[in-house]
Amino acid sequence: MATVNQLVRKPRARKVAKSNVPALEACPQKRGVCTRVYTTTPKKPNSALRKVCRVRLTNGFEVTSYIGGEGHNLQEHSVILIRGGRVRDLPGVRYHTVRGALDCSGVKDRKQARSKYGVKRPKA
């Protein structure tokens, strides 16, 4: 236990919280250009071909972003919006592509959870 005199001379150091999404720089989303669109395989118990893209952001960061939903229209030089949110079974993927924003289209024929995949309400 520090004495009062020690604390007067050198106060207690505050713990600095480290961000899980440093490339966003405290913004809710960031815009970027796809430099590579590819598939990758997940970690051990799971098996699939996950769709991801490498993105060069407007602030100069280059990050890997997951493309959620069934099917996408992204290719190299597509301009996309990314948000935070990691993919647990893909190491190094800490961002998600926002569907239905900029060049990334919404998921075709999506009926449920539409807002997460950028789909307008269907005409009844």
Curated annotation (Swiss-Prot):
Belongs to the universal ribosomal protein uS12 family. Part of the 30S ribosomal subunit. Contacts proteins S8 and S17. May interact with IF1 in the 30S initiation complex. The modification N6-acetyllysine is found at residue 108. With S4 and S5 plays an important role in translational accuracy. SUPFAM superfamilies: Nucleic acid-binding proteins. Keywords: Acetylation, Methylation, Ribonucleoprotein, Ribosomal protein, RNA-binding, rRNA-binding, tRNA-binding. One of its GO terms (cellular component) is small ribosomal subunit. InterPro entries: NA-bd_OB-fold, Ribosomal_uS12, Ribosomal_uS12_bac. It comes from the Bacteria. The modification 3-methylthioaspartic acid is found at residue 89. GO terms for biological process: translation. Pfam families: Ribosom_S12_S23. This is Small ribosomal subunit protein uS12. GO terms for molecular function: rRNA binding; structural constituent of ribosome; tRNA binding. It comes from Escherichia coli O6:K15:H31 (strain 536 / UPEC).
